[in-house]
Amino acid sequence: MQAPPSFYEGDTLEVAKKLLGQKLVHIVNGIKRSGIIVEVEAYKGPDDKAAHSYGGRRTDRTEVMFGAPGHAYVYLIYGMYHCFNVITAPVGTPQGVLIRALEPVDGIEEIKLARYNKTDITKAQYKNLTNGPGKLCRALGITLEERGVSLQSDTLHIELVREEEHISSQYKITAGPRINIDYAEEAVHYPWRFYYEGHPFVSKK
């Protein structure tokens, strides 16, 4: 079943950890593409210097961060790679969780085509399908068109995985510093990256 609106409410760090093991789903041209979330990063504006909303900075791009939890925040890095975030916290508190890596599940052939323009790929290429925020967006067809979309929609949502199928029993959740935020002064060291230790699709060990 889809995660209800209440799933995204509450402390952002706790929501980040709850997202691990759940399934991110995007329906593209009627075909389901999905992956199990194995790595996330929490961003807690306005006090977090790594957050786009640090200091309460409000722009056209970040406006969705100030809205209701349970919406998609998508942005570009380096002008070419999309990043997908889940908005958390109450209205007016601009916080969210970046989805950093997935284990692909549904629509594998479409995911391969999106990433490599072919379906016959090597084992190394398979491991690189969705092991990074830009890679997973390309694989699932997530673009700026999805910015601000409610995660209660039929085409973009988080699907809760049943307890008996959840991979949390197989992997330990580890916390550590977030990646590529050297500009963020003391926030560089916050242990707000959560991931399944040893999972092959985690972006950085």
UniProtKB/Swiss-Prot annotation:
Q: Does the keyword Aminoacyl-tRNA synthetase apply?
A: no
Q: Which UniProt keywords apply?
A: DNA damage, DNA repair, Hydrolase
The family database entries (Pfam families) matched by this protein are listed as:
Pur_DNA_glyco (PF02245)
The record's section on Gene3D superfamilies has: Methylpurine-DNA glycosylase (MPG) (3.10.300.10)
Enzyme Commission code: 3.2.2.-
Q: Which terms in the Gene Ontology molecular function aspect does this entry carry?
A: alkylbase DNA N-glycosylase activity; DNA binding
**SUPFAM superfamilies (alphabetical):** FMT C-terminal domain-like (SSF50486)
GO BP annotations listed: base-excision repair
Q: Does the keyword Cell division apply?
A: no
Signal sequence: where? none
UniProt cross-references to InterPro entries, sorted A to Z? Formyl_transferase-like_C_sf, MPG, MPG_sf
Family the UniProt entry places it in: Belongs to the DNA glycosylase MPG family.
What NCBIfam families does its record include? 3mg (TIGR00567), PRK00802.1-1 (NF002001), PRK00802.1-3 (NF002003)
Q: What is this protein called?
A: Putative 3-methyladenine DNA glycosylase
